[in-house]
Amino acid sequence: MTMTAGRLEAIWIKRAHRGPMDPVQEAQLDPARGLIGSVDRSRRRQVTLLEAERWAGLMRELHAEVDPRARRANLLVSGVSLYQTRGGVLQIGSVQLVIGGETTPCERMDEALPGLRARMGNAWAGGAFAQIRASGAVRVGDPIIWV
């Protein structure tokens, strides 16, 4: 993992199961409560991340243009690779996240675009899930580094 700075490109909160991913400019993350306002409250998967570059690559491969919010991740990041980073600590603004593993794409990916689920099953293309180590606010545009 390098110290190259990335950027937080988007934040989405899911307020209801199977509900839309609502874009926000800022969100609060808390180790005890997860992503504040999000219906997902798993202790293991408190927040999910997707690489903007990987998503764009998938869209090129599939000759499609699907909004990355279709992935249903909470944070869209650029400039940092999530590939095989389990156990790594990512800092976004003042918030620290511990990468727990690769997210597994569900059938909803094929609802968004036929064939997307299979393509996302390779090399962490579906993103990563994390636990919140240090709480605080994250904002679109925040710098991202590995610590």
Please provide the spans of the model-predicted regions.
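Metal-cofactor-dependent catalytic cores
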Residues: 1-147
